Amino acid sequence: MKKILLFAVLVLCARLAAAQTTECKFTQARTIQASGKVIRSEGVISYKSPDQLTMTYTDPEGEYLVISGPMLRSNTLGQKISVDTDKNARFKILRNTLLNCIDGNYEQAAKDNDADLSVSEKNGVKTVQMKARKAAPRGYSRIIMEYIKGLPVRMVLEEFGGISTEYLFKY
């Protein structure tokens, strides 16, 4: 009986540990290369492995990006969308790239974006760089991730069209 109870408690603890939520503040700087214009925003990000991500913007207030399973919902610049990523390849790459980069699964993100991968570590900061092997209609031309103690602290997503978005995460 004690062994069964102990086993049940261990299984429950393992499930709870796997379902932990990570939450922090973030800043975002979106740079449009053609004009040099930089659009800044900030908010709170909440991630629960493996497929729950919420970015709630406090500036501009009311904007959000929510990933829940295969669904991706956002309100950006007054445009609301709701997409089933199982039926939309462009948004599936965006969804998977965000989830994999936040989770530290950069090998899969590189594979999804057909990118070469390099990883280095200096002074406790792991830097991951992914560079697309060729131009593509979807995905990212370059991705840079920085992690400290397994948590993402910086993410740069460069699109083929010349838009670069940098996120800084503050725990």
Language model features with spans:
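Positively charged n-region of N-terminal signal peptides that target proteins for export
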Residues: 1-4
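N-terminal signal peptide c-region/cleavage motif recognized by signal peptidases
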Residues: 13-14
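Flexible, processing/modification-adjacent segments and terminal tails
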Residues: 21-32, 37-38, 77-132
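One face of beta-strands
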Residues: 22-26, 41-45, 53-55
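Short hydrophobic/aromatic-rich beta-strand segments that constitute the beta-sheet cores
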Residues: 26, 53-57, 72-75, 128-130, ...
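Short, surface-exposed coil-to-beta transition loops
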Residues: 39-42, 60-61, 68, 138-142
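An acidic-aromatic
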Residues: 45-96, 165
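Gly/Pro-enriched, hydrophobic low-complexity segments
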Residues: 119-171
